[in-house]
């Protein structure tokens, strides 16, 4: 049964773990596309990449020098050099096509194919060439300075696993085995409906009657960081306008910012209930207690609080998980975690998770702000956040805590 909380308040707040479990159980339809390597950085590999070739495909010189038979160098020294005849040259892309016999050598450059008959490469500093005569001044063991076929990658090797967020060097590896394109997950489309008659778009100077939107730019950057494509639309604080926007939504998931709390103009929860399913409204989380989520048909919809820090918190813990799952990424937070010691206590209450902005300096964790859902500047001053679990009443000064770092992301 739908409970209209406007001007009444919440009867129950869902546990954070309960909401996370619901998000992670949402069905995900995996859409894939083939993209050229030039466009693949940062995309998520949909299928494992298996090499069909050895890399290198041929024995190649690891040094500049001469390709020859190692046996012809045994016993050579500075005071007792051996002499061989140079019968050709092997260059990268222009190999020597003959066979190296006993007493012969081929001038060779790094990366060039080692010709048939040769089994070692004598370093340039270990020989002297005059005309076609090579003076060998040090022995070169069989196999020395020769890169063998497949020493980098063997045919049949899985070089990149499915689910990998592609890095620049991954694209180089793909190219080295002959791939010009890769099959990746499609980037999920996220429609963000920003509500609030008091809001004006980015680039507009705020004044006594309006507020420049902060949630739209923040969410766009977060969504794109997590592999999605964001479309931002501004919707008046009118039920009919929001209803039309929800009914016409063409996206893989829908976010509504603002209009999710207990005010008279907070229409989003009621409309989500009427148009689909309102799974949760109200979470035991500070500062994102008014958050909600549900379904529009088969698509997830997230009601994110209008206060900027609450919006960021609800994205970090809930909505972002779904964006990442839709795009084939790991659902868990992308923030790298560190540990430090609290410089002062953090107070909380049982039954609620607290998202606390903190600075981390040389292992010391300093709370920036434990409340103030509208103070977005606190997140720019912070290095990250800590989460106080629902079964804690806070942490004392000196406690060891885990920090989620805003600027450090795992791939």
Question: How would you name each of these model-derived features?
Answer:
Residues 1-16, 180-304, 308-314:
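Helix-rich terminal scaffold detector
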């Amino acid at each position: 049964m739908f409970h209209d909380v406007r001007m009444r308040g919440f009867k129950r707040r869902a546990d954070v773990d309960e909401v996370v479990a619901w998000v992670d159980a949402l069905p995900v339809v995996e859409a894939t596309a083939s993209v050229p390597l030039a466009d693949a950085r940062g995309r998520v590999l949909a299928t494992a990449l298996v090499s069909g070739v050895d890399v290198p495909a041929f024995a190649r010189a690891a040094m500049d020098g001469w390709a020859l038979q190692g046996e012809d160098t045994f016993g050579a020294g500075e005071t007792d050099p051996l002499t061989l005849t140079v019968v050709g040259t092997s260059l990268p892309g222009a190999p020597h096509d003959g066979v190296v016999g006993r007493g012969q050598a081929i001038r060779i450059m790094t990366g060039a194919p080692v010709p048939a008959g040769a089994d070692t490469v004598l370093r340039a500093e270990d020989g002297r060439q005059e005309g076609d005569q090579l003076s060998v001044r040090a022995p070169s063991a069989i196999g020395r300075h020769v890169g063998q076929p497949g020493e980098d990658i063997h045919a049949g090797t899985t070089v990149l696993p499915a689910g990998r967020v592609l890095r620049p060097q991954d694209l180089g590896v793909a190219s080295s085995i002959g791939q010009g394109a890769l099959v990746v997950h499609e980037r999920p489309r996220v429609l963000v409906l920003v509500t609030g008659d008091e809001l004006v778009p980015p680039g507009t100077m705020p004044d006594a009657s309006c507020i420049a939107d902060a949630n739209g730019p923040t969410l766009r950057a977060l969504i794109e960081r997590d592999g999605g494509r964001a479309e931002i639309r501004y919707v008046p604080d009118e039920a009919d306008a929001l209803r039309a926007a929800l009914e016409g939504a063409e996206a893989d998931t829908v976010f509504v910012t603002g209009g999710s709390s207990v005010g008279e103009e907070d229409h989003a929860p009621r409309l989500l209930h009427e148009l689909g399913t309102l799974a949760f409204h109200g979470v035991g989380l500070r500062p994102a207690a008014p958050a909600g989520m549900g379904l529009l048909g088969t698509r997830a919809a997230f009601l994110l609080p209008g206060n900027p820090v609450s919006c960021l918190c609800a994205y970090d813990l809930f909505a972002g998980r779904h964006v990442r799952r839709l795009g084939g990424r790991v659902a868990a937070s992308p923030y790298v975690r560190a540990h430090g010691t609290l410089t002062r206590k953090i107070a909380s209450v049982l039954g609620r998770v607290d998202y606390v902005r903190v600075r981390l300096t040389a292992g010391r964790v300093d709370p920036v702000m434990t409340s103030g859902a509208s103070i977005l500047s606190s997140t720019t001053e912070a290095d990250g956040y800590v989460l106080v679990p629902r079964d804690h009443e806070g942490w004392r000064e000196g406690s060891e805590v885990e920090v989620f770092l805003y600027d450090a992301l795992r791939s």
